[in-house]
């Protein structure tokens, strides 16, 4: 009888421990700070990502040099835009494909060369799977998230006027110069604007 009682007690304790571990598993992400390693030469990006996902949308400060190999440095004063692919912590520049930069109001022309914006650091936040920031100069709040294969951008325009989204196909996180896109075309469906 004694061994049966001990076995039942051990089984009950194992079930309680398993249930407790399973219940607490989802709460562990509250301990994650995606900004750790984003300054200096940590080569980490606060991009939104899921484990083993194909995309990681996040901010890019620059596309040049070893110190910016993730595309992001916390102390950099401006954001160039938001690209859809990043490698975090690798120490070598790669990806940074298809940079997007939203703005409200008439800001850019065909002759414009600087599309960057200063982020409001008080509004910049990241948690596993989500990145957010406000760009006051561009009149937009940016929210990025990811699924296994899709980068999702949401832009909330805080200023009236003309809304623009720059799509930069030449941007990429690489060492050196040279063409990244050698041939491209674009068209606008006149019926849809």
Regions found by a protein language model. Give the residues of each.
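Positively charged n-region of N-terminal signal peptides that target proteins for export
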Residues: 1-6
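Bacterial N-terminal signal peptides
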Residues: 7-17
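Accessory carbohydrate-recognition regions in carbohydrate-active enzymes
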Residues: 22-193
């Amino acid at each position: 009888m004694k061994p049966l009682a001990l076995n039942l007690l051990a089984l009950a304790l194992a079930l309680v421990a398993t249930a407790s571990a399973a219940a607490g598993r989802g709460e562990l992400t509250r301990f994650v700070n995606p900004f750790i390693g984003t300054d200096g030469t940590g080569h980490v990006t606060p991009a939104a990502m899921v484990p083993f996902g194909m995309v990681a949308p996040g901010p890019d400060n620059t596309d040049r040099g070893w110190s910016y190999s993730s595309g992001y440095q916390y102390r950099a004063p401006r954001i160039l835009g938001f690209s859809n692919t990043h490698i975090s912590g690798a120490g070598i520049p790669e990806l940074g494909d298809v940079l997007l930069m939203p703005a409200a109001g008439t800001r850019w022309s065909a002759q414009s060369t600087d599309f960057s914006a200063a982020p409001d650091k008080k509004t910049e936040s990241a948690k596993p799977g989500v990145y957010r920031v406000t760009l006051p100069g561009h009149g937009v709040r940016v929210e990025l998230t990811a699924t296994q294969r899709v980068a999702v951008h949401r832009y909330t325009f805080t200023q009236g006027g003309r809304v623009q989204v720059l799509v930069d196909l030449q941007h990429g996180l690489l060492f050196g110069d040279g063409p990244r896109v050698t041939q491209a075309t674009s068209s606008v469906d006149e019926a849809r604007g």
